[in-house]
């Protein structure tokens, strides 16, 4: 939340770290990214940084290391952060290559204790990252390679990962990371834009991001498939993952 970010930045200004190490799932790492901005620029306003690719130059005081313990957001390798304003019921996606971590530690053993439901939610987030990056108008040969391999890995290994299989958890942790590499350049689509908007809009608690993605993905595939290019790409992704 915005409140968490501001408290964390204040604490950082007190002990002045030269490295910021964020460990956890998407929410704590995303929060730490935003804290990093306000640690280095206390006078900066949140209203300014919600403008895409408008951040001040970071690494004036500290570098950033991200250690992911869930297999979904891939925030450890992306230029994005999502911060919630609970007072307004809004999720703000922050976007700037400045907040891409300097170091990412992707250790599958940290995911072995993930509950099955968390595994499902984060896994659907990773799958959505791949699908949206693959049909994006910003897709390229480089993003396609990561997105397609990520789709195939997730389709094969997510059910086994849900059941707690350690080999599957390893595959999922690596797949979600390459999904992040894919969408960092290929970008995302309306599944994520709707998931961010509706995810924080309910008074009695937000919709978990991966669940929101899962709710919208099928409908968006139907909508996007009205475009011949997107339809062709969806069809190829299905054949590539051996679903037919």
Per-range role (PLM):
Residues 3-10, 14-106:
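Glycine/threonine-rich beta-strand-loop-alpha-helix active-site module
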Residues 4-8, 16, 31, 123-126, ...:
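General structural feature for long, well-ordered alpha-helical segments within catalytic domains
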Residues 70, 130, 220:
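Active-site pre-Tyr helix/loop in NAD(P)-dependent dehydrogenases
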Residues 72, 181-208:
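Glycine-rich phosphate/pyrophosphate-binding beta-alpha loops
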Residues 80-186:
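Carboxylate- and glycine-rich phosphate/diphosphate-binding segment that chelates Mg2+/Mn2+
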Residues 200-243:
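Gly/Pro-rich interdomain helix-loop hinge
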């Amino acid at each position: 939340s915005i409140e968490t970010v501001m408290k964390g930045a204040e604490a950082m200004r007190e002990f002045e770290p030269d490295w910021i190490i964020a460990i956890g799932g998407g929410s704590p790492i995303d929060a730490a990214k935003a804290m990093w901005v306000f640690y280095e620029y206390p006078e900066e306003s949140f209203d300014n940084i919600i403008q895409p690719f408008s951040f001040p130059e970071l690494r004036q005081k500290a570098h950033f290391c991200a250690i992911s313990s869930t297999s979904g957001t891939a925030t450890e390798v992306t230029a994005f952060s999502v911060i919630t304003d609970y007072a307004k019921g809004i999720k703000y996606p922050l976007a700037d290559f400045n907040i891409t971590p300097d170091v990412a530690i992707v250790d599958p053993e940290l995911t072995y204790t993930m509950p099955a439901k968390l595994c499902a939610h984060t896994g659907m987030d990773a799958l959505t990252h791949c699908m949206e990056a693959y049909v994006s108008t910003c897709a390229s040969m480089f993003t396609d390679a990561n997105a397609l391999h990520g789709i195939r890995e997730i389709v094969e290994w997510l059910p086994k990962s849900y059941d707690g299989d350690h080999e599957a958890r390893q595959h999922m942790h690596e797949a979600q990371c390459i999904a992040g590499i894919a969408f960092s350049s290929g970008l995302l689509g309306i599944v994520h834009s709707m998931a961010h908007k509706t995810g924080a809009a309910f008074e009695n608690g937000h919709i978990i991001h991966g669940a929101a993605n899962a709710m919208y993905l099928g409908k968006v595939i139907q909508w996007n498939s009205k475009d011949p290019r997107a339809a062709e790409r969806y069809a190829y992704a299905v054949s590539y993952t051996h679903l037919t």
